[in-house]
Every structure is written in structure tokens, then in C-alpha cells.
Amino acid sequence: SHPEIDVIEEKPLINSVEQLIKSKFKYSLDELHKLSSKDLEILRNHYLEILKSNCDNKNAKILIDKFPFQTVCLPLINLLFPNSKIIFTHRNPYDTVLSCFQQSFEPNNAMSNFRNIEAASKIYDLTMSIWLDYKTKLKINFITSKYEDLIEDFENHILKILNYLDISWDENIKNYRNTAHKRGKINTPSSSQVVQPLYKSSISKWKNYEKYF
């Protein structure tokens, strides 16, 4: 809802770069160090071209790629865009697992991990372990955003993120629901919630299902 920011829907854009590394340069993702400066420039331009083609706001100063499975891609992202800013969003682990389990995802290899609570818990644990490892070993510029903090104090929490992005506050941010409505179809698993007001009922919701954890 900020005029200077465009958020790209949850699309695996970085996967296209990974495929190009394998098909064009014949390297595995464990061989990123073998890529030359020229190779990186080609890959960088490839990603940016795809990213911009998926933008709604062509005048946006900042583009946010919010594909949720990009944690495992941080080494590649950091290599291509060492000055990029990472916003790591998280919430209570139990609520995260429950929410993923309750979503109606389009079937694919990644989403199959959410077919039951146990499998969802394992993929969450793996993802968080990867994050904890990468954030100490990689020189990444990041800020964390906790869902519960957002619910508790929306304006101050958003302001903290805007300051990190070097963007000023805009009153239109409060109208995020109207912005979502105007976009029409939203291709995210939680699309029905995007147009809803922020609510506290989702906090600690997992306790209603505690016996399943």
C-alpha cells in the first residue's frame, strides 16, 4: 500500500535463476563460487527482468520478492545482490506450523511437506535451522519482523521496517485492504486473509489443537 513499494506475489522467481545456472553454466548450486563476474551479471539481469515483468507499480522505488521458500536460496541471493535488504518474517512456531497445515496449497513437492503436523513441523525446523546458520555465516543485511509484534503495534512495527528500507511513512499503508481488493485475484495461499483486518485471534491458535503437537 506504499506508493514507493511494490510487493511481488508469491512466485518462485529465483528458481528461474537456479535453472539457468544448471542449464547454461552447467554448475550445481554447490558450485556458486565457480561463477565468474560476467556469469553473475547475466544471472542478475535475468532475475531483474523477470522481477520487473511481474511488477504492478512500474514506478516503485523498492521491489519486494516475498516468495516464502527463499530462505534456502540466501547464498545465491547474497551472491547476486550483496547490497539487498532481507526482511525475515516469522511468528510463533506452533502457529506457523498449524497455519501451513490448514492452508489449501496447490500440490507440489514443497507443499507436500504440509500434509500433516509432523511433516510441517520438520520442514519448519529445517528452514529455521538454515536461517540461523546463514544469518551468522553470510554477510547479509537483514531485519526481523514478528507477526505478534505487528498485531500488537501496527504503526510502530511498520515504521521500523520503513526506516530500515529508508522509506517515509505513508498514510495509505493503513489502507492495505483496499489495495488488496483493487489488485483483484491474489495468488497466495492466504489470499482470503489478505483483505481481512488484522486480528489477534490467530495468535496462540495452536493451543486449540495442542494434543496434535
Predicted regions and their residues:
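Short, internal active-site loops enriched in acidic
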Residues: P68-Q70, E148-I151
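PAPS-dependent sulfotransferases, especially Golgi type II membrane carbohydrate sulfotransferases
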Residues: L20-I21, Y27-K61, V97-T144, E152-F213
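Phosphate-binding active sites in nucleotide-utilizing proteins
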Residues: S1-F81, T89-H90
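Conserved phosphate-donor/acceptor-positioning beta-strand/loop module used by diverse small-molecule
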Residues: L76-Q102, I161
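Hydrophobic/aromatic beta-strand patches that form the interior of the parallel beta-sheet core
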Residues: D6, K85-I87, I143-S145
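Conserved nucleotide-binding/hydrolysis micro-motifs of P-loop NTPases
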Residues: P12-I14, R91-T96, D149-I151
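Conserved coil-to-alpha-helix start sites within the AMP-binding
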Residues: T71-L74, D95-T96, M128
